[in-house]
Amino acid sequence: MSLTDYRQAFEIVKRNILAGNSYLANLTCKVPVSTNLTLEDVFRYSKALYRLWLKDKLVCFSPEIFVRIEDGEIKSFPMKGTIDATLPNAEKLLMDDSKETAEHATIVDLIRNDLSMVAEQVRVVRYRYCDRLETNKGPIFQTSSEICGVLPDDYPSHIGDIIFRLLPAGSITGAPKSKTMDIIEEAENYERGFYTGINGLL
């Protein structure tokens, strides 16, 4: 993507935010990558907590859980806010940053609302705690929250419906989700496909 094309996409998002149509949008673009590594090499090289390799098809990795369902509860752990952990006072800088705080509050509210579509008694169990993650370029601090809700008794026979109702993930779209998805579609002008999707284990 050229800088001109990126600026055009960015301006679409900016215009909509200034108009009040969205207050958080995750703008992405395709980036060509040339490497002599195989998909398996990339998979094995990644230090991400969650990763998937489908032979000759794709590789993906993420530090973030979309949802965890067990014992009648659904949990989500949205992440927003990152800083280089080697910086002096990095954790304090991250926790005191007003932009990062605002973005995190927005995504927590969005995920809480999303979980309320499929669960009762939705609550924020832990708000804005800091995790240290190891990456190939060094350690980072990332802020997360834990949100939990109680699923109906018959949830095991409706797992697919629950997951599809929550998609796409709020952390890779924005808020309000529906309108922001329209803005993203106009700005990005490409299909994300598997990118920013989810995978899981039953």
Residue ranges and their predicted role:
Residues 1-202:
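Extended alpha-helical targeting/anchoring segments
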